[in-house]
Amino acid sequence: STNVLTALRTAPHIDGSQTERRAIKHLVRCMREGIRPVNILIKIPLLLPGEYAVTEIEPARSLYAKLQDIESQQGILDASILIGCAWTDSPYTSVSVIVVAEENSQKAREYAGSLARDIWMRRREFGPDVETVPVEEAIEKAMKAEERPVFISDSGDNVTAGGAGDIPIILEKLLDAGASDAVIAGLADPDAVRLCIQAGVGSDITLNIGGELDRVNGYPLAVTGTVEHLDPPSLAVL
């Protein structure tokens, strides 16, 4: 069981330290004053990819701003919005609202219900704040762009949200398009790293990259390249 629930309030997440301090403050207060907090959770039947709920743009900006208004009410300890992970195949994933009361569960339920209704009423306003296109089209636009650099993000294979981080599809499409001035931020493949270490810096090598951790969404890609840099035992640059 949990005494007090509190969550991050920024997306992308930049308020980790503030959230930790807030949780500790609540816990210490409850211990010192003998408060027995009540956590009220309301789940909303809504799946939102994280990039649809960036807190610097609407509607997330004004919805998250309501949290402080709720917390300012007498008898309320904390309030949180949890976007959830849309890609998690689980009955527990969805947007949720949590309000923590000092003791009065009815008051917490009222505030949680009001915030949940606000989110539901604005559900069609959620969306990405950047252009979304198929991989091939994204690469074509990036190669023609006059302003550089251009970032292409695979929001599905997200290692901070449960993705394997080893899907080489974008790399494959870049090679097919002849994008010689592109950089892939990283692919998880311990076996490929070991092969590069065995070959040594400056060596030409042909090997398979990616597609080992998750064969559902990706597959190994055969590539040939030069080992440019090594940081054993965990990093190789081709």
Language-model segments: residues:
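Accessory alpha-helical/coil subdomains and C-terminal extensions
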Residues: 35-42, 48-137, 144
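Short glycine/threonine-rich loop-to-helix capping motif typified by GTGT followed
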Residues: 52-59, 141-143, 159-168, 196-201
